[in-house]
A protein has these predicted regions:
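Metal-dependent phosphoesterase/phosphodiesterase active-site architecture
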Residues: 1-167
């Protein structure tokens, strides 16, 4: 804060300030109870698959999803594929990593997610772009309202697993 000038910056736990978003290769996500909660009862498996319905089926549409953690309308999201600009589209969808790290784990352990952990609502800060190829590398640049820049060179195909996102 400097007089009436207020600035802030999001910092995720266990990461540095430059980790402002996470990317998902939709072609590599098939979210079923068999994949992520294999020990869940049939009713829990059904509940999980209902909650994860947007991610349940395989896709070859070449969409990449970008979860921008502290997004507001003053941010800029820029994506290029082989030098060609792709237009990010803001979508309303559940975060797939949240589904597998919270809901699937609880169902797999024989309990239901609490309302604090269950992804009952969609996320309002996920964008998607449609790539032309399943194996292209995307250059992603996110700039917050204060000019702080975060980048990723997303090599595809990119596997979807909890371990992949711990890196």
């Amino acid at each position: 804060m400097n007089g009436t000038d207020v600035k802030w910056r999001f910092k995720p736990t266990g990461r540095d300030f430059n980790y402002a978003f996470r990317t998902y290769d939709r072609n590599k996500i098939v979210m079923t109870a068999a994949n992520f909660a294999p020990k869940a009862s049939s009713s829990h498996a059904s509940s999980f698959e209902s909650s994860a319905s947007s991610w349940k089926s395989s896709s070859k549409d070449n969409y990449v999803y970008i979860n921008v953690f502290d997004y507001d309308k003053s941010w800029m999201i820029e994506v290029t594929e082989n030098g060609k600009s792709l237009t990010p589209e803001l979508v309303s969808i559940k975060d797939p990593l949240h589904l597998v790290t919270y809901e699937a784990k609880r169902y797999n352990d024989g309990s239901a997610p609490t309302s604090d952990f269950k992804a009952r609502t969609v996320t309002s800060h996920i964008f998607r772009v449609k790539a032309s190829s399943a194996s292209s590398t995307l250059e992603i640049k996110v700039t917050d309202r204060f000019g702080n820049v975060s980048t990723e060179s997303m090599k595809r195909p990119r596997e979807f697993s909890i371990d992949e996102y711990k890196k």
